Amino acid sequence: MKILQYALLACLLVSILGDDDDEENEGAAGSDDAGATPTALSKPAATSAEGNTAAKNSGGDIKQPKQELPEPSSKGQKKPRLPKRCLFKPEQGNCAGSRFLPRWWYNPETESCEPFTYPVCNKKNEAFVSCTLCMNMCMRNKRGREKAKWIRKVCRKSPKVKSG
């Protein structure tokens, strides 16, 4: 009986702490969105945890992020911006006893999607369910047949999934 009580208490504490983190992140993300500029691909560490939670929703509904229009760079050339979902970075968590799901994230340094394991206790939904979906949404430097060939090449590999 005590084990059940401890398990319920642990679940309650995790949900309270998770809700507090969500409220803090949503408040910070709301203030950052007004003057947000695209993150340069050469600086992936500039993405913060607040930016990663901006696309979060409640109730388990999956919403597709809107495709953002290209914004001119300093040289006058148009450089396409990545959707927020493509800026997601897998983070280390401490979800003790949690199940882990295989998911994909876009790595702008390699310009490809990479697998990782995703703890079920996280409420974020920015990670991609499949490599193909990830590559189709985030890869901007190739078009048409070249893009399809690259997606098949990257997604056909079966790399080791790293823990996130």
From Swiss-Prot:
Observed phenotype of the null mutant: The tick attachment time is prolonged and the engorgement body weight is decreased after gene silencing by RNA interference. No significant difference is observed in the feeding period and survival.
Coiled coil: none
GO cellular component, one term: extracellular region
Keyword Signal among record annotations: yes
Induction conditions: By blood feeding.
Disulfide bonds: C86-C138, C95-C121, C113-C134, C131-C155
Compositional bias segments (type: Low complexity): 27-36
Gene Ontology molecular function terms on file: serine-type endopeptidase inhibitor activity; toxin activity
Record GO biological process: envenomation resulting in negative regulation of voltage-gated potassium channel activity in another organism
Cellular compartments annotated: Secreted
InterPro entries tied to this protein: Kunitz_BPTI, Kunitz_BPTI_sf, TFPI/VKTCI-like
Ranges of residues in domain BPTI/Kunitz inhibitor: 86-138
Tissue distribution of the protein: Expressed in salivary glands.
Signal peptide limits: 1-18
Keyword terms: Blood coagulation cascade inhibiting toxin, Disulfide bond, Hemostasis impairing toxin, Protease inhibitor, Secreted, Serine protease inhibitor, Signal, Toxin
Biotech utility: May be studied for future application as a vaccine, since it impairs tick attachment time and engorgement body weight.
Region (Disordered), start-end ranges: 20-84
Biological role stated in the UniProt entry: Anticoagulant protein that may inhibit serine proteases. The anticoagulant effect of this recombinant protein on blood clotting is found both in the recalcification time (RT) and the activated partial thromboplastin time (APTT) tests, indicating it acts in the common pathway of blood coagulation.
Protein name: Anticoagulant protein rhipilin-1
